[in-house]
Amino acid sequence: MVTKTITEQRAEVRIFAGNDPAHTATGSSGISSPTPALTPLMLDEATGKLVVWDGQKAGSAVGILVLPLEGTETALTYYKSGTFATEAIHWPESVDEHKKANAFAGSALSHAALP
């Protein structure tokens, strides 16, 4: 019997930037287009559903999407706590540095640059 060893090469992807516990929850999805994992989320005032954070108001992001969505899902899973790598988060293109820095103010989420 011949055994062949295969060495897997993986890219090191670090999404966490601290040792805070990262807890998840599920919520109603208001997302209607394909959305990558690690996208900041906010509550839609009209529907009460979780949608992609628009980057307009600091402190209004309440979660980070755990898994990518196709846009047809009625529910989603999101991180409700933890410290994430700033570089790993899929930020809105229009967000400025001040709003990004304080996106999760008042929540159990935070972010920091990786060393």
Curated annotation (Swiss-Prot):
GO terms for cellular component: viral capsid, decoration. The keyword Phosphoprotein does not apply. It is found in: Virion. Belongs to the lambda phage gpD family. Pfam families: HDPD. The keyword Transcription regulation does not apply. Keywords: Capsid decoration protein, Capsid protein, Late protein, Virion. Stabilizes the head shell following the rearrangement of the gp7 subunits of the head shell lattice that accompanies expansion of the head. This is Head decoration protein.
